[in-house]
């Protein structure tokens, strides 16, 4: 959000502050007027509350104090509503195609506005469909994209490999990209790439943008799993997208209250929908395979009528209970240093997320059983609370440093303890209902076979025997 605000025009910032005023949004220093009382006192200036009469820096300073996810989503939605191209593809029409329905499902998802809020006004960004001539009909209608990223010295992520496949699963792009910053972490355990792999890379992000634009027009549909991360590192803002992490969702039927699990992973979707794992345990990612998998998931819906809800089984929940989620990890803290943060006594494995932002990243801590994960969480001495999803969470301070402020990470449960019981109870209930239906159906058939003949049919049978 900060990058977007820094490049936004003044009139846009004024509108956002007015939206925040109207909704009564509060940042770290309160509402807009409360913020001004604090802010102007520090600067020693007079307080003008009309946003249109304030400097751009003042507006940005207030908006960056808004930290609640739901508040940021509201602001992101306000920004997106100004995008005519976005509005065009968001609306439902009578002649809507199956492909466009998936685009609309993505664009109307609650998480979309914030995920796809890009600083596309910046000079090095490309916005498709704006002032560009539409390409000839040789264009590919759907393209799946996936990228591999590394961590740079300044804390930013840089794309180092890009893959794109078309609707026929033909690879139309597979390029190594030269990072424009010194790399501090190649994330070989995820990307499979090393410094040697990139020694001969000469292509820049600008070159990749030009190559992509050879295939993309305003009407092209870009496909991907958590595609916003890939578009962000490519610095491409494209309105017509299908994000499989937003299209597919867990089936929560039968539970007493909504479950707040993370979005289904690409691997889990492939297992449920396609019947295979795209990412094997201990094997680095391959962006070509990941792009193909995302396209196959979309084709499974379009060509085979696959459902967009995936089952929530007790086995899956048990596996989730064997994990803890580490987040808000500062990018300057290597993941290897996290091994003893959650527990020094209980064996576990730390698996960093493939996707990271400029300042923080997240990781999954995997234990051998739900009991060990729960014990590790109970042993943490940090402050207990709930995250925005209502899940149990604690704060862990890292080892103090003499030269830096004390850093901390947050650790939370993946699911609450009673949810597995709910799902098991619902599965047992469903099995019981199924048995009752089968028994009822069997009993009905038996009664029909044993039903006495009427007197007329009995006399008829006697006559035949005579």
From Swiss-Prot:
<dbReference type="InterPro" id="IPR012337">
    <property type="entry name" value="RNaseH-like_sf"/>
</dbReference>
<dbReference type="GO" id="GO:0004527">
    <property type="term" value="F:exonuclease activity"/>
</dbReference>
<dbReference type="InterPro" id="IPR047021">
    <property type="entry name" value="REXO1/3/4-like"/>
</dbReference>
<dbReference type="GO" id="GO:0005634">
    <property type="term" value="C:nucleus"/>
</dbReference>
<comment type="similarity">
    <text>Belongs to the REXO1/REXO3 family.</text>
</comment>
<keyword id="KW-0539">Nucleus</keyword>
<dbReference type="InterPro" id="IPR034922">
    <property type="entry name" value="REX1-like_exo"/>
</dbReference>
<keyword id="KW-0540">Nuclease</keyword>
<dbReference type="InterPro" id="IPR036397">
    <property type="entry name" value="RNaseH_sf"/>
</dbReference>
<keyword id="KW-0269">Exonuclease</keyword>
<feature type="region of interest" description="Disordered">
    <location>
        <begin position="426"/>
        <end position="466"/>
    </location>
</feature>
<protein>
    <recommendedName>
        <fullName>Small RNA degrading nuclease 2</fullName>
        <ecNumber>3.1.-.-</ecNumber>
    </recommendedName>
</protein>
<feature type="domain" description="Exonuclease">
    <location>
        <begin position="142"/>
        <end position="298"/>
    </location>
</feature>
<feature type="compositionally biased region" description="Basic residues">
    <location>
        <begin position="445"/>
        <end position="466"/>
    </location>
</feature>
<dbReference type="Pfam" id="PF00929">
    <property type="entry name" value="RNase_T"/>
</dbReference>
<comment type="function">
    <text>3'-5' exonuclease degrading single-stranded small RNAs.</text>
</comment>
<dbReference type="GO" id="GO:0003676">
    <property type="term" value="F:nucleic acid binding"/>
</dbReference>
<dbReference type="InterPro" id="IPR013520">
    <property type="entry name" value="Exonuclease_RNaseT/DNA_pol3"/>
</dbReference>
<keyword id="KW-0378">Hydrolase</keyword>
């Amino acid at each position: 959000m900060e990058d977007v605000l820094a490049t936004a025009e003044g009139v846009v910032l004024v509108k956002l502050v007015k939206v925040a005023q109207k909704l009564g949004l509060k940042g770290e220093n309160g509402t807009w007027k409360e913020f001004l009382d604090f802010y102007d006192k520090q600067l020693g200036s007079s307080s003008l509350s009309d946003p249109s009469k304030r400097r751009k820096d003042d507006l940005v300073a207030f908006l960056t104090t808004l930290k609640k996810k739901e508040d940021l989503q509201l602001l992101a939605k306000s920004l997106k509503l100004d995008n005519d191209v976005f509005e065009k593809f968001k609306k439902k029409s009578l002649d809507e195609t199956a492909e466009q329905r998936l685009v609309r499902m993505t664009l109307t998802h609650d998480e979309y506005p914030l995920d796809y809020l890009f600083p596309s006004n910046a000079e090095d960004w490309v916005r498709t469909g704006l002032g560009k001539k539409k390409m000839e009909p040789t264009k590919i209608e759907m393209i799946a994209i996936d990228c591999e990223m590394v961590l740079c010295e300044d804390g930013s992520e840089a794309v180092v490999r890009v893959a794109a496949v078309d609707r026929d699963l033909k690879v139309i792009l597979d390029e190594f990209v030269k990072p424009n910053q010194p790399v501090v972490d190649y994330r070989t355990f995820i990307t499979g790439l090393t410094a040697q792999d990139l020694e001969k890379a000469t292509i820049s992000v600008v070159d990749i943008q030009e190559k992509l634009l050879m295939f993309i027009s305003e009407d092209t549909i870009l496909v991907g799993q958590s595609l916003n991360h890939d578009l962000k590192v490519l610095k491409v803002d494209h309105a017509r997208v299908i994000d499989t992490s937003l299209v597919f969702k867990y089936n929560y039927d039968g539970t007493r209250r909504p479950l707040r699990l993370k979005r289904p992973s690409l691997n889990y979707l492939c297992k449920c929908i396609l019947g295979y794992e795209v990412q094997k345990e201990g094997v680095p990612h391959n962006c070509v395979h990941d792009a193909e998998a995302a396209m196959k998931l979309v084709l499974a819906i379009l060509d085979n009528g696959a459902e967009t809800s995936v089952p929530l089984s007790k086995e899956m929940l048990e596996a989730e209970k064997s994990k803890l989620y580490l987040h808000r990890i500062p990018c300057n803290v290597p993941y290897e240093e996290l091994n003893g943060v959650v527990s020094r006594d209980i064996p576990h494995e730390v698996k960093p997320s493939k996707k990271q932002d400029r300042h923080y990243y997240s990781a999954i801590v995997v234990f051998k059983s739900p009991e060990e994960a729960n014990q590790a969480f109970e042993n943490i001495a940090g402050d207990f609370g709930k995250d925005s999803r209502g899940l149990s969470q604690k704060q862990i301070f890292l080892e103090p440093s003499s030269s830096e402020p004390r850093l901390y990470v947050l650790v939370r449960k993946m699911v609450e303890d009673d949810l597995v019981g709910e799902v098991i109870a619902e599965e047992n209930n469903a099995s019981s209902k199924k048995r009752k239906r089968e028994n009822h159906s069997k009993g009905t058939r038996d009664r029909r076979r044993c039903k006495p003949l009427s007197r007329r049919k009995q006399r008829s049978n006697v006559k035949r025997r005579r």
